Amino acid sequence: MQEALALFFGSESLLVGTIIPFLFVLTVVVFVHEMGHYLVARWCGIGAQAFSIGFGPELLGFTDRHGTRWKLSAIPLVGYVKFIGDESETSSPVGVNESALSEEDRKRAFHTQPVWKRAATVFAGPAFNIILTIAIFSVFFALYGRQIADPLIAGVQPGSPAAEAGFEPGDRFVSVEGEKITTFADVQRIVSGRAGDKLNFTVERDGKMVDLQAVPKIVERTDPLGNKVKLGAIGVETTEAVGNFRRIEYGPLESVGQAVIETGHIIGRTGEFFKRFAVGREDKCQLGGPVKIATMASKAASQGFDWLIQLMAMLSIGIGLLNLFPLPPLDGGHLVFYAVEAIKGSPVSGAAQEIFYRIGFLLVMGFMGFVLFNDLFAC
């Protein structure tokens, strides 16, 4: 009996070691996303009927003085905010039953608002996810600073792309693909996502600028959480003596600035990844679903609470960006409809919305099935 309890409730058990960290991270990210929708809707004068974390049967909840039902539902993988008059899947004014709404409800209904208010409300969810990531990074930069190294080459691996391109120990990176380089991590950031691409490098050698070209090759590395990841590399390294390893400390405003820059880099790398993935140039196993996220949450929790919060930051921006994909079931799909409405002066027809919604729904379900298959069988 004790062994059974330890298996389920012990610190390394399925419940405590995996399920609780996973639900903690996911619930916070989903809550922030939906809170973005809710707060901006309130600021725009839109009424909310329900705010739910999860879907399915309600487990517990309460109704506030504004008439909004706040609830925790049985399946805590997603969340939603149900606005007054928001009856259709596409959150459009087409097909809404006006007679079912009172005069007061019509004033506060989602579909009666100007298109910019509806667009702002929809965009706020992904935006709040990105803001959460920036906030977490800001705290970490303020507390821990950043470890950096000068962009100096200490060694070149024989037979590597760098060796074939003519890189030499002592070279200092000046730019990669026209982007100015200030730390060795800048080089790693650019090169890691460009395996197979011919990249242009400028290095300083003996006081002179030298232009070189190299094609990063794919290498498999183990990240701090023990995950196998495939990255681009050219085969150069630095050392503490050559690279002058050091920690930079940041004040509050500097921390926010660094967090914004880091978040921008992540957005850029994510866009580059999906662009390459669409043409078959990225490893499909780099995409994971709930099983992979749960595994990562378990590993992060075992490393410490700060690791779990870092995972939350990465998951938050991932969900924010995913929701901006221009497919109708997602926030990005709604924004496309609103953009068309703003341009032509009237909503997209109900028939057209229905067609695009069905296509988008199938694509989203296909993507979810793909990543789940990766989780369970392929990777």
UniProtKB/Swiss-Prot annotation:
Its EC number is 3.4.24.-. InterPro entries: PDZ, PDZ_6, PDZ_sf, Pept_M50_Zn, Peptidase_M50. The keyword Cell inner membrane applies. GO terms for biological process: proteolysis. GO terms for molecular function: metal ion binding; metalloendopeptidase activity. The chain crosses the membrane at residues 39-61, 122-144, 305-327, 355-377. Pfam families: PDZ_6, Peptidase_M50. Keywords: Cell inner membrane, Cell membrane, Hydrolase, Membrane, Metal-binding, Metalloprotease, Protease, Transmembrane, Transmembrane helix, Zinc. Residues 133-208 form the PDZ domain. Zn(2+) binds at H33, H37. It is found in: Cell inner membrane. The active site is at E34. It is a multi-pass membrane protein. This is Putative zinc metalloprotease BMEI0829. It comes from Brucella melitensis biotype 1 (strain ATCC 23456 / CCUG 17765 / NCTC 10094 / 16M). The lineage of its organism: Bacteria, Pseudomonadati, Pseudomonadota, Alphaproteobacteria, Hyphomicrobiales.
